[in-house]
Regions:
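Intrinsically disordered, low-complexity regulatory regions of eukaryotic regulatory proteins
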Residues: 4, 390, 425, 454, ...
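Alpha-helix boundary/capping motif
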Residues: 450-451, 455-457, 463, 470-471, ...
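Glycine-centered signal
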Residues: 263, 434-437, 455, 467, ...
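A short hydrophobic/aromatic micro-motif that marks alpha-helical segments and, especially, helix-coil
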Residues: 322-323, 382, 469-471, 477, ...
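Detector for intrinsically disordered, low-structure N-terminal pre-sequences
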Residues: 9, 199, 460, 465, ...
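Charged catalytic and DNA/RNA-contacting regions of genome-maintenance
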Residues: 1-337, 342, 349-362, 366-452
Length: 492
């Protein structure tokens, strides 16, 4: 491949960005298409069964290209992620009309199998977890390696659920079968010590530094000390947590504002099941074929995807604590005795996936229709909360407290959003009339509803925006449409 300096300006920009993400496919926005280039194009063409073409030449060679329309990008992303690929999404962030050279572009996020948050890319009834594995000490002989401490941290980015556990090398396969991560991060120097079915990403060994991990964890949780979380003095756990958080933050190009706590799991909390036992019990995966019966399919009558995912988690984590199991039984008994189960189930059927919407809000990637779904769900949640308040069980009371929401949240969303907003601001209107006077004026201008007084006001506004007194902005209404004319001020 020619060196970047020999390429056209657009391809120089592409190669600079690609050099920052050498190990993932680069989805490069060009107008109404996302394009792959060079080796990425050849690989994507095979994986997606799309046409491999060439677009002109750069650096003295033809440029291999393969692209998909922006409107169908989600379905192609889903296929790539299902195949274990990671994709960097490079968007146009500059204005093409104002750009003298290539339009400014930036990678806004990296989509990987373990960091999915888009509803269209996620299974409704299963979580996608990202795990990081830290080995305490260098590789030695196999007998000693089996007794070494291994730290595992995992994060479900679509809900903000961060957990960690400490095990030994010989117990690692059983723990991975329990956690079932969609992607694993491991140090480059430890890659040969890990045999896993999930896609594995390697990072430099220093990403697994325990002191760095402690600092990243304190910053993420907003605390001065980690004493309350039970990780101090456990270097393998701290190393795994630090590498996990660093990788997740890098993929999102955003703070993980919804990740606010850490739960440490102990092998003594649950009934121990090795990988073979889990498979033979057919808890969630059938022995023969993808469509075979499983215990999960038999039991799953949940009204929401959130409930189905919780049930799946419980099946893989059978409790040893009789008190915790009894608390669940008490709530179920109270629901049945009060005859509330059908009413609550019906109410839940109209509740969207709040876990995933909340995560996307925190990551600043929520779509308008998701916010509208949240707005419409809030009154239903309050009705469910009142129904649960009638149940006299400790676990039910804790649920009632957890469901308390800010009083003005629904009013704010109702006042801000249209009843049926567009899928995205590019597709149409999102904000309700009356929320922002300036936006209302611009909509009136777009619709051609502007008169002489409005034209004068628009002229003054535009002069302030331009910041020059030698520019004249004039508005004229012609055939129901408004035209803005910009020209030099004449000397008086």
């Amino acid at each position: 491949m020619p060196t970047p300096v020999e390429h056209t300006p657009v391809m120089q920009q592409y190669l600079r960005i690609k050099a920052q993400y050498p190990n993932v496919l680069l989805f490069y926005r060009m107008g109404d298409f996302f394009e792959f280039g060079y080796e990425d194009a050849e690989k994507a063409a095979k994986l997606l069964n799309i046409t491999l073409t060439s677009r002109g030449s750069s650096g003295g060679a033809r440029v291999a290209m393969a692209g998909v329309p922006v409107v169908s990008v989600d379905q192609h992303l889903a296929r790539l992620v299902k195949l274990g690929e990671s994709v960097a999404i490079c968007e146009q962030i500059g204005d093409p009309a104002a750009s003298k050279g290539p339009v400014e572009r930036k990678v806004v996020r990296v989509v990987t199998p373990g960091t999915l948050t888009d509803t269209g890319l996620l299974a409704d009834k299963a979580d996608a977890a990202l795990a990081a594995i830290a080995f305490d000490g260098p590789a030695r002989d196999a007998r000693r390696d089996r007794r070494d401490a291994v730290g595992i941290a995992w994060l479900v980015l679509a809900s903000g659920d961060l957990r960690a556990t400490e095990t030994t090398a010989d117990r690692l396969p059983s723990e991975l079968a329990r956690i079932a991560p969609s992607e694993i991060v491991v140090a480059e120097g430890a890659r040969e010590r890990l045999a896993a079915a999930a896609p594995v990403q390697t990072v430099p060994d220093w990403h697994f530094d325990a002191q760095r991990g402690a600092q990243l964890l304190r910053e993420q949780l907003g605390v001065a000390t980690l004493q309350a979380f039970g990780v101090e003095g456990r270097p393998a756990l701290l190393a795994a947590c630090g590498a996990l958080l660093a990788y997740a933050q890098q993929t999102q190009s955003e703070r993980l504002a919804h990740v606010t706590t850490l739960r440490i799991e102990s092998e003594s909390d649950f009934v121990a099941l090795d990988a073979v036992t889990r498979r033979n019990l057919e808890l969630t995966e059938p022995l023969r074929g993808d469509d075979g019966p499983t215990l999960f399919k038999v039991l799953d009558r949940c009204a929401t995807g959130m409930g189905s995912r919780r049930l799946r988690h419980w099946l893989h984590h059978p409790l040893r604590d009789a008190g915790a199991a009894s608390a669940r039984h008490a709530v179920i008994e109270s629901l049945l005795d009060a005859g509330l189960a059908p009413r609550i189930a019906e109410g839940l059927r109209h509740v969207p996936d709040l876990d995933r919407i909340a995560a996307r809000v925190a990551l600043k990637s929520a779509r308008p229709r998701e916010l509208a779904a949240l707005r419409d769900a809030l009154p239903r949640l309050e009705a469910l909360r009142r129904a649960l308040a009638a149940i006299d069980a400790p676990l039910a009371r804790s649920l009632v407290d957890a469901m308390a929401l800010p009083a003005d949240l629904h009013e704010t969303l109702a006042r801000t959003l249209l009843a049926e907003p567009a899928h995205s601001p590019r597709d149409g209107d999102v904000i309700a009339a009356g929320f922002d006077p300036e936006l209302d004026e611009l909509r009136a201008l777009r619709a051609g509803h502007v008169g002489g007084g409005d034209a004068d006001r628009l002229q003054r506004v535009d002069l302030r925006r331009v910041g020059r007194d030698d520019v004249a902005v004039r508005a004229a209404v012609e055939h129901g449409r408004t035209a803005l004319r910009v020209g030099q001020q004449r000397e008086q």
